Amino acid sequence: MASSMAATATLSPPVLSAERPTVRGGLFLPPSPATSRSLRLQSARRCGISPATRKPRSLPRAAKVVVAVKADPLKVMIAGAPASGKGTQCELIKSKYGLVHISAGDLLRAEIAAGSENGKRAKEFMEKGQLVPDEIVVNMVKERLLQPDAQEKGWLLDGYPRSYSQAMALETLNIRPDIFILLDVPDELLVERVVGRRLDPVTGKIYHLKYSPPENEEIASRLTQRFDDTEEKVKLRLQTHYQNVESLLSIYEDVIVEVKGDALVDDVFAEIDKQLTSSLDKKTEMVASA
C-alpha cells in the first residue's frame, strides 16, 4: 500500500511555489508581478526554452505613406477694351482649362432675375438710374467665387474689377488672381470692330460689315446699328477703359500679362495658353517644394 502511494506521488506534477490569488475583504488580489514573472520563467524551462536566448519579437516597421499633393486650381482675371475679343478668348480658356467663367454683368442680371437679397438691392439703384454700389457687386462676386464649383475647378473673372476701389475690396477679402490677362488692341482696330457691328433684330445675331457680313441681301436690309456702337461712343468707352486699367496696375502689376489681341483668334489664344500653362506650372512647383 505504501509503495502504491509512493508511485502515485512520483507521477504527480510538480507543485510550483507560487503565490495563489487571495481574497481579502471581498477583493481579488492577483499574484505580485515578480511572482507572475517567476511562473512564466518556470513554464519556459519546462518547455525547453532558455529565456536568456529567446529572441524578442520584432515589431513591424511603420509603413511609409506617400501623399500626392495637388496644386490649387487656377484663378484668372481677364480685361480688355470693347471689341478686344475678350468674350471669344474666355470661351476658349473655359473650354481647355475647365474654369468657371464669371462675368460681373451676367452675375448681376442673374441675381436680379432670381430675386436674391443682393439682386433686390441692386435693382433699387438701377430703377433710379443710379450705378450699383461696389459693395453690392463685390458681395455678389465673393459669394459666387466661394461656390463649390469655383473652388474645385478654379475661376475666370471676366471684366472685373474695373476700378481701384473694387480691386481693393477684393484684396480685403483675400481674393487675388494667379494671373491677370490684359488684351492689348490698337485703338483704330477697336473702333473699326465696333463701328462695323450690326444687329439683326429678328434673330438677335451680331454681324460685322467687314469680318462677318450677312448671308444674303434680305438679312442685310434689316440690320441695325446699336446706339452705343458709334465712333463717338466707342472712343468715350475706350477712355474709361484705359483709366480703369491704369488704376489697377498698382495692385496687380506683379501678375499682369499683356497679350496682343490684334492677331488671329487662334494665335491670340496660343499666347494666352502659354501664359496660363506657365502659371499653373509655377503653382505645382511651389506645392512640390513646400
Curated annotation (Swiss-Prot):
<feature type="binding site">
    <location>
        <position position="166"/>
    </location>
    <ligand>
        <name>AMP</name>
    </ligand>
</feature>
<feature type="transit peptide" description="Chloroplast">
    <location>
        <begin position="1"/>
        <end position="61"/>
    </location>
</feature>
<dbReference type="GO" id="GO:0009507">
    <property type="term" value="C:chloroplast"/>
</dbReference>
<dbReference type="Pfam" id="PF00406">
    <property type="entry name" value="ADK"/>
</dbReference>
<feature type="binding site">
    <location>
        <position position="226"/>
    </location>
    <ligand>
        <name>AMP</name>
    </ligand>
</feature>
<dbReference type="InterPro" id="IPR027417">
    <property type="entry name" value="P-loop_NTPase"/>
</dbReference>
<feature type="binding site">
    <location>
        <position position="109"/>
    </location>
    <ligand>
        <name>AMP</name>
    </ligand>
</feature>
<protein>
    <recommendedName>
        <fullName>Probable adenylate kinase 2, chloroplastic</fullName>
        <ecNumber>2.7.4.3</ecNumber>
    </recommendedName>
</protein>
<feature type="region of interest" description="LID">
    <location>
        <begin position="196"/>
        <end position="229"/>
    </location>
</feature>
<dbReference type="GO" id="GO:0004017">
    <property type="term" value="F:adenylate kinase activity"/>
</dbReference>
<feature type="binding site">
    <location>
        <position position="193"/>
    </location>
    <ligand>
        <name>ATP</name>
    </ligand>
</feature>
<feature type="binding site">
    <location>
        <position position="197"/>
    </location>
    <ligand>
        <name>ATP</name>
    </ligand>
</feature>
<dbReference type="GO" id="GO:0005737">
    <property type="term" value="C:cytoplasm"/>
</dbReference>
<dbReference type="InterPro" id="IPR033690">
    <property type="entry name" value="Adenylat_kinase_CS"/>
</dbReference>
<feature type="binding site">
    <location>
        <begin position="206"/>
        <end position="207"/>
    </location>
    <ligand>
        <name>ATP</name>
    </ligand>
</feature>
<dbReference type="GO" id="GO:0005524">
    <property type="term" value="F:ATP binding"/>
</dbReference>
<feature type="binding site">
    <location>
        <begin position="130"/>
        <end position="132"/>
    </location>
    <ligand>
        <name>AMP</name>
    </ligand>
</feature>
<keyword id="KW-0809">Transit peptide</keyword>
<feature type="binding site">
    <location>
        <position position="237"/>
    </location>
    <ligand>
        <name>AMP</name>
    </ligand>
</feature>
<dbReference type="InterPro" id="IPR006259">
    <property type="entry name" value="Adenyl_kin_sub"/>
</dbReference>
<keyword id="KW-0150">Chloroplast</keyword>
<keyword id="KW-0067">ATP-binding</keyword>
<keyword id="KW-0808">Transferase</keyword>
<feature type="compositionally biased region" description="Low complexity">
    <location>
        <begin position="1"/>
        <end position="10"/>
    </location>
</feature>
<dbReference type="InterPro" id="IPR000850">
    <property type="entry name" value="Adenylat/UMP-CMP_kin"/>
</dbReference>
<feature type="binding site">
    <location>
        <begin position="159"/>
        <end position="162"/>
    </location>
    <ligand>
        <name>AMP</name>
    </ligand>
</feature>
<keyword id="KW-0547">Nucleotide-binding</keyword>
<keyword id="KW-0418">Kinase</keyword>
<feature type="binding site">
    <location>
        <begin position="83"/>
        <end position="88"/>
    </location>
    <ligand>
        <name>ATP</name>
    </ligand>
</feature>
<dbReference type="GO" id="GO:0097009">
    <property type="term" value="P:energy homeostasis"/>
</dbReference>
<feature type="region of interest" description="Disordered">
    <location>
        <begin position="1"/>
        <end position="37"/>
    </location>
</feature>
<comment type="similarity">
    <text>Belongs to the adenylate kinase family.</text>
</comment>
<feature type="region of interest" description="NMP">
    <location>
        <begin position="103"/>
        <end position="132"/>
    </location>
</feature>
<keyword id="KW-0934">Plastid</keyword>
<comment type="function">
    <text>Catalyzes the reversible transfer of the terminal phosphate group between ATP and AMP. Plays an important role in cellular energy homeostasis and in adenine nucleotide metabolism.</text>
</comment>
